[in-house]
Each structure stands twice: as C-alpha cells, then as structure tokens.
UniProtKB/Swiss-Prot annotation:
Residues 1-206 are cytoplasmic. GO terms for cellular component: endoplasmic reticulum; endoplasmic reticulum membrane; nucleus. It holds the Pfam family UQ_con. This is Ubiquitin-conjugating enzyme E2 6. It comes from Schizosaccharomyces pombe (strain 972 / ATCC 24843).
Length: 227
C-alpha cells in the first residue's frame, strides 16, 4: 500500500504527464493500485524497434520517491527478457544511485534511451537487428492476442491495433504477387523467343530463297521462249 507521500507524489506526476506527455511514451497507474504503472513505448523511428508497441510495468515501492521502481517489459522486443526485472541505474537494482528528484518521466526517457543502445545489462538479451525488426512487426498482435493486461490498461488502443494489423496483412498480400510476377526471364527463354536466332527460322529463310530463285528461273525461261 502506498504511503501518503508516495500517493501524493505519483498523482502529481500522473497529472504532469497528462499535461506534458513524454515523446513516444504513454504511462498511467492501475486504477486499483497507484504503485503499479503501465507504460507503452512506441518504437523510435530509424531503429530496429520502429513501428513497435512495447508494453511494460513500473512497480513503485510504498516509500517512493525515496526508492526506485522495478522495471519490466512484457511485450517481446529482442532487447529485454519479458516479465523480468531490468538492471538499470534508475531501477530497484541500484537504490544507492537513485535520486529522489527523478520522476516517472525521467525513468521513461531513460528506458527509451537504454533500449535503443547496445549496452548489456541483467534482464537484457542479445539478438540481431533483423530479429528485433521481426519482433517489432508482431508487437501489436501480441498485445491484443497474448497480453491480457494490455487489454485492461489500454482498451483505447485495441481497435487501432486491429486496423493496423489488417492493413499490414493487406499490404503484404499485395507485395507477394508482384514479387512472383516480376521474376526475370532466363537467358534460355530469351533465345527461344528470338526468331532470327533459331534453327527453325533459318530453315524457313532458306526455303524462301529457293522459291524465289525457282520463280526467277521460270520467268527467265518464259520470256526467253517468247523472244
């Protein structure tokens, strides 16, 4: 249960976030427990997470802001283990380095910055850039199909996620046939379609010449007979 100080501080920070949101981040407390916050990070552009939607939690101690929160990410990202406490300088792994003047917005900005770095930490995983991009494409499907807490905390995003998923599927369906029909013609097929390079066309040309010669000789004899 939150102390009066923690409750007052977290409510103040929530109102501040509503007034001045953090770029690429949405965050709010659970209605039944102000110490349990849920965040959504929108994958920053020009990163392997672009277009992704990453849901996670901040679990604050009852005596916040004097101690830092536990930070977890629920949506698979290829960057962090899911549902695992992350070792960050502003998380509960490092209470001695925590500064009580830091706020929820400070934590969220730091989390986005760390996520897009290559720094290794407890709770982090190492994957390729292509793997992270693959995860990013699947985040919205995961959140509405395999993440019940997301449905509770962010119901306003459900329909939008479904629309985005349907749109992505439609675009993929359009791209695949184009790729199939754009298969280049092989050199052998090109040669088959070049009439003057085929043996059959050469034979036809020889027969045409022979016929012309025959008619020329016949005409010569005909006119010679008349003379």
């Amino acid at each position: 249960m939150a102390s009066k100080g923690a409750y007052k501080r977290l409510m103040k920070e929530y109102l501040a976030l509503q007034k001045n949101p953090v770029e690429l981040v949405d965050a709010k407390p659970a209605t039944e427990n102000i110490l349990e916050w849920h965040y959504i990070i929108t994958g920053p552009p020009d990163t392997p997470y672009e277009g992704g939607q990453y849901h996670g939690t901040l679990i604050f101690p009852p005596d916040y802001p004097f101690k830092p929160p536990a930070i977890r990410m629920i949506t698979p990202s290829g960057r962090f283990q899911t549902n695992t406490r992350l070792c960050l300088s502003f998380s509960d792994f490092h209470p001695k380095s925590w500064n009580p003047s830091w706020m929820v917005s400070t934590i969220l900005v730091g989390l986005v910055s760390f996520m897009t770095s290559d720094e290794i930490t407890t709770g982090g995983i190492v994957t390729s850039e292509s793997t992270r991009r693959t995860y990013a494409k699947d985040t919205k499907r995961f959140n509405i199909m395999d993440n019940p807490k997301f449905l509770i905390m962010f119901p306003e995003l459900i329909d939008k996620n479904r629309e985005d998923i349907a749109k992505a599927a439609a675009e993929a369906a359009l791209i695949e046939p184009q790729q199939i029909h754009s298969t280049p013609v092989s050199s052998n097929e090109c040669k088959k379609n070049e009439p003057f390079n085929s043996k059959q066309s050469w034979v036809k040309s020889r027969w045409s010449i022979a016929v012309l010669v025959f008619f020329a000789l016949a005409l010569a004899r005909f006119f010679g007979a008349d003379s």
